[in-house]
A protein has these predicted regions:
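Cation-handling catalytic/transport regions enriched in His/Asp/Glu
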Residues: 1-214
Length: 214
């Protein structure tokens, strides 16, 4: 569990940073769209010159493993097992659930990853994110069934770390300025949705509960 004071401090810090985070970015995006103010429904619209480069599954695998290995070879070695032993269900097909997750099962077995890979840069990030969970789950397995499970705050730290390792490697390997702008914009929007939007939800729900108490 996360203490209430910690949650309140986090929420306040993010809210105080709204002008420097979401407000600043959306003003910039409005300029890219030739608008004075960005419309609400255009917040997540692709940039005008976004052709969304496609990656093969093998390219995505190599990018993630190389990014992991550059940080720590053991991290890459563990992630490699997910490919070699077919612990990843990535192919889209009719009737398959959407979304993505890494299920830890039990420590005596191994995790399974579900995702839908369409070759977009965001799919590469999803693969890196879920493998971050998977590596974490493998490493926590020796703690046993009662101690290996982790709260979301800890689990998401591992997954976002793996995702950011891969993103930085992808960005450093991209030489086209327009493509670099698209990658950075996509990552900023992902982080706004993961952090700023969630805090906005939190503030709304807190107000609803406070009003209900009155």
């Amino acid at each position: 569990q996360v203490e209430d004071d910690v949650v309140d401090a986090l929420a306040s810090s993010v809210k105080d940073a709204y002008p420097d985070l979401s407000h600043r970015y959306y003003k910039l995006k409005a300029k890219w769209f030739g608008q004075e103010q960005l419309e609400y429904w255009d917040r997540n619209a692709p940039l005008p010159d976004d052709s969304d480069k496609r990656y093969s599954w093998d390219e995505a695998r190599s990018m993630v493993l190389e990014a992991y290995g550059a940080f720590e070879p053991q991290m890459s070695d563990i992630a490699q097992r997910f490919f070699d032993e077919r612990w990843i269900d990535a192919g889209p097909r009719p009737g398959k659930d959407s979304g993505a997750f890494s299920h830890p099962t039990v420590p005596s077995a191994h995790p399974y990853i579900l995702m839908n890979f369409h070759g977009k840069s965001r799919d590469v990030m999803t693969l890196a994110h879920e493998l971050g969970h998977g590596v974490h789950q493998i490493l926590s397995g020796p703690q046993g069934a009662l101690m290996s499970d982790t709260p979301l705050t800890t689990a998401e730290t591992a997954s976002v770390f793996g995702e950011m390792l891969t993103f930085r490697a992808m960005l450093e390997g991209e030489t086209d300025p327009a493509r670099r702008k698209i990658l950075l914009a996509g990552k900023v929007e992902d982080m706004l949705k993961s952090v700023v939007r969630q805090i906005a939800f939190h503030h709304f729900e807190t107000k609803v509960h406070d009003e209900r108490k009155v």
